[in-house]
Amino acid sequence: MGVTVETIQPGDGKNFPKKGDTVTMHYTGTLQNGSVFDSSVRRNEPFVTQIGVGRVIKGWDEGVLQLSLGQKANLICTPDYAYGPRGFPPVIPPNATLNFEVELLKIN
């Protein structure tokens, strides 16, 4: 249970976000069956958020803190680190394990 980080492309290995930092990243979220439910890449608009402070799902709050600048990775979030038993109707079903391909573009 939790979040698993699988590196696709390494980052700089030096610059990591800290709790409270604002990060800019691209992501594509998929369900276990491979269907895409959201993508900043498709919108061509990077996602900006404060990380580690509860503004995003727990899987992101913990997973993104493990990424270094420029890193591309899969964040695999179990339901307890995603949307849990409620899901996010109608897009995400209850108790869904989610996969996010993320790229950390900037740490502000």
UniProtKB/Swiss-Prot annotation:
- For this protein, the Enzyme Commission number is 5.2.1.8
One Gene Ontology term, aspect cellular component: cytoplasm
Activity regulation comment = Inhibited by both FK506 and rapamycin.
Q: Where is the signal peptide?
A: none
From the UniProt record, list the reaction(s) this protein catalyses.
[protein]-peptidylproline (omega=180) = [protein]-peptidylproline (omega=0)
The UniProt keyword set, sorted, is:
Cytoplasm, Isomerase, Rotamase
- Give the superkingdom in one word: Eukaryota
Coarse class of the protein's main subcellular location:
cytoplasm
A Pfam family that the UniProt record links to this protein: FKBP_C
Which compartment or compartments is the protein found in? Cytoplasm
For the PPIase FKBP-type domain, which residue ranges apply? 20-108
Molecular function terms, GO-annotated: peptidyl-prolyl cis-trans isomerase activity
UniProt enzyme class: isomerase
Keyword Cell inner membrane annotated:
no
Give the region (Disordered) as residue ranges: 1-20
Which stretches are annotated as coiled coil?
A: none
Family, per the entry? Belongs to the FKBP-type PPIase family. FKBP1 subfamily.
Q: What does this protein do?
A: PPIases accelerate the folding of proteins. It catalyzes the cis-trans isomerization of proline imidic peptide bonds in oligopeptides.
Quote the protein name from its UniProt record. Answer: FK506-binding protein 1
State the species of origin.
Answer: Rhizopus delemar (strain RA 99-880 / ATCC MYA-4621 / FGSC 9543 / NRRL 43880) (Mucormycosis agent)
Gene name per UniProt: FKBP1
